[in-house]
Amino acid sequence: MEINREDFEESIVNIGRVTKVVKGGRRFRFTALVVVGNKKGTIGFGAGKAKEVPDAIKKAVDNAFKNLSKVSIKGTTIAHDIEHKYNASRILLKPASEGTGVIAGGAVRPVLELAGIKDVLTKSIGSNNPGTLVRATVEALGRLKG
């Protein structure tokens, strides 16, 4: 599958900072979680770690392009209800009528918007960890039957 990176938009879902205390002070490292999508049914997510934020974001974007997946979209919404669990995060996605918009919070919204879904109702249950929520959402979208 030949991809043109210019067709894709990216959204930074989360940037985290971890600190290592050493003799000379504190050493910071950054993690970035990024979602990429072309708003036409192709979506990917990736994580990156580096000593500087821009480097972490670049690594995350590169990883996101390495694991792209197709999503089945029916008009402006999804074909049917679906519930998916990944680790402690559970996500429930329901189709919505046109004009409803994306009713989603936190890390779920950028995934759905970049996939090209315009009308959907969602509920996240359990852990609100951005990484597991994004993965649960992408896996749920991948399980949709056309």
Swiss-Prot record:
Entry superkingdom: Bacteria
Entry-linked InterPro entries: Ribosomal_Su5_D2-typ_SF, Ribosomal_uS5, Ribosomal_uS5_bac-type, Ribosomal_uS5_C, Ribosomal_uS5_N, Ribosomal_uS5_N_CS, Ribsml_uS5_D2-typ_fold_subgr
Listed GO biological process terms: translation
SUPFAM superfamilies named among the record's database cross-references: dsRNA-binding domain-like, Ribosomal protein S5 domain 2-like
GO cellular component, one term: small ribosomal subunit
Keywords: Ribonucleoprotein, Ribosomal protein, RNA-binding, rRNA-binding
S5 DRBM domain span: 8-71
One annotated GO molecular function: rRNA binding
Record-linked Gene3D superfamilies: 3.30.160.20, 3.30.230.10
Function in brief: With S4 and S12 plays an important role in translational accuracy.
Domain text: The N-terminal domain interacts with the head of the 30S subunit; the C-terminal domain interacts with the body and contacts protein S4. The interaction surface between S4 and S5 is involved in control of translational fidelity.
Record family assignment: Belongs to the universal ribosomal protein uS5 family.
Subunit structure: Part of the 30S ribosomal subunit. Contacts proteins S4 and S8.
Name the record gives this protein: Small ribosomal subunit protein uS5
Gene name linked to the record: rpsE
